[in-house]
Amino acid sequence: MKFLLFLSVALLLTSFIETEAGPVNEAGVERLFRALVGRGCPADCPNTCDSSNKCSPGFPG
């Protein structure tokens, strides 16, 4: 339930930024979402970790 709340907030924030400031940098939104949810990737694979926070080369972000 907590996850859905954070997801809703992230999506609302994304749509607000998109309408107010033009196109959104997807990497920035992903970092914002991870910060809100509290999910962090290891330093050696900051953009390719899976839900267990382990490096996963096939994971799309």
Swiss-Prot record:
Subcellular location(s) per record: Secreted
Propeptide: 22-38
Statement: the UniProt record of this protein carries the keyword Mitochondrion: no
Gene Ontology, cellular component aspect: extracellular region
Residue list for modification 4-hydroxyproline: P57
UniProt entry tagged with the keyword Coiled coil: no
Stretch forming the signal peptide: 1-21
Post-translational modifications: Contains 2 disulfide bonds.
One GO MF term: toxin activity
Predominant location category: secreted
Known tissue expression: Expressed by the venom duct.
Protein name (Swiss-Prot/TrEMBL): Conotoxin Cal14.6
Organism phylogeny: Eukaryota, Metazoa, Spiralia, Lophotrochozoa, Mollusca
